[in-house]
Structures are given as structure tokens and as C-alpha cells.
């Protein structure tokens, strides 16, 4: 039985890992052994941060809504409680966008919430 030479498969595997390490700094981009570890770690960070991204954006939306509603004389918690009471079902992403790009519409929602809370 002939001897199996692994040159082609090894080269392909190395090329794949080094392609994934493109843009890394130092030896992480061109030394296979180090690049392999760097690519694995990058994958772990990417996996973790895809989940964290959702939490980060929710915090951003809440901070924006809080700032906008406070400027109109209402705290975030009272604003959200008033939305629930008034049966206004708008999610935080849309409220945040509205507070930045359409302050008049956001102000009218705050007025409805204030009327509901009064």
C-alpha cells in the first residue's frame, strides 16, 4: 500500500486558517500555530458578543428613552408604566428612534402617558 502524503490537505488547512487570520497583528497573521489559536479565540469572542450585542442595544435604547422623557418631565420607569396603562404597544427600539428623529411624535406620546398617569 502506498504511503499517504499529507502535503495537499495540510496546505489547504493552513491556507484556510491563515485566511481567517487576515488582518490580525504580528505573528498572529502568518504563523499557522499562533494564527490557529487566535482564530479560535476570535470565534469565541464573536459568539459571546453576538449575544451581548442584544443586551447592549437594549441598554442604549433605554438610556435614550430615559433622556428624552426626562427632558419632557417624566422618568423612564413612570413613562413605561404609563405606556402600559395607556395600552400603547411600542417597543423600546422604535421609541428610541422616535425620540431622536421625530421628537414631536415622541412628545405627543409623552402627553398621552401624562394624561393617563394623572
UniProtKB/Swiss-Prot annotation:
Signal peptide: none
PROSITE patterns: RIBOSOMAL_L20
SUPFAM superfamilies attached to this UniProt entry: Ribosomal protein L20
InterPro entries, per database record: Ribosomal_bL20, RIBOSOMAL_L20_CS, Ribosomal_protein_bL20_C
GO terms for MF: rRNA binding; structural constituent of ribosome
Pfam families reported in the protein's UniProt record: Ribosomal_L20
CDD domains the UniProt entry points to: Ribosomal_L20 (cd07026)
Any one GO BP annotation for this protein: ribosomal large subunit assembly
Keywords on record: Ribonucleoprotein, Ribosomal protein, RNA-binding, rRNA-binding
Any one annotated GO CC term: ribosome
Family: Belongs to the bacterial ribosomal protein bL20 family.
Function: Binds directly to 23S ribosomal RNA and is necessary for the in vitro assembly process of the 50S ribosomal subunit. It is not involved in the protein synthesizing functions of that subunit.
Protein name: Large ribosomal subunit protein bL20
Organism in which the protein naturally occurs: Leptothrix cholodnii (strain ATCC 51168 / LMG 8142 / SP-6)
Gene name for this UniProt entry: rplT
Amino acid at each position: 500500500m502506498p504511503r499517504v502524503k499529507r502535503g495537499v490537505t495540510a496546505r489547504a488547512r493552513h491556507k484556510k486558517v491563515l485566511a481567517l487570520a487576515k488582518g490580525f497583528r504580528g505573528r498572529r497573521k502568518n504563523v499557522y500555530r499562533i494564527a490557529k489559536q487566535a482564530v479560535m479565540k476570535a470565534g469565541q469572542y464573536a459568539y459571546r458578543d453576538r449575544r451581548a450585542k442584544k443586551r447592549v442595544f437594549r441598554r442604549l435604547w433605554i438610556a435614550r428613552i430615559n433622556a428624552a422623557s426626562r427632558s419632557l418631565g417624566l422618568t423612564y420607569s413612570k413613562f413605561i408604566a404609563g405606556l402600559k396603562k395607556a395600552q400603547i404597544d411600542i417597543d423600546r427600539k422604535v421609541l428610541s428612534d422616535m425620540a431622536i428623529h421625530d421628537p414631536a411624535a415622541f412628545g405627543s406620546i409623552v402627553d398621552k402617558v401624562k394624561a393617563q398617569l394623572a
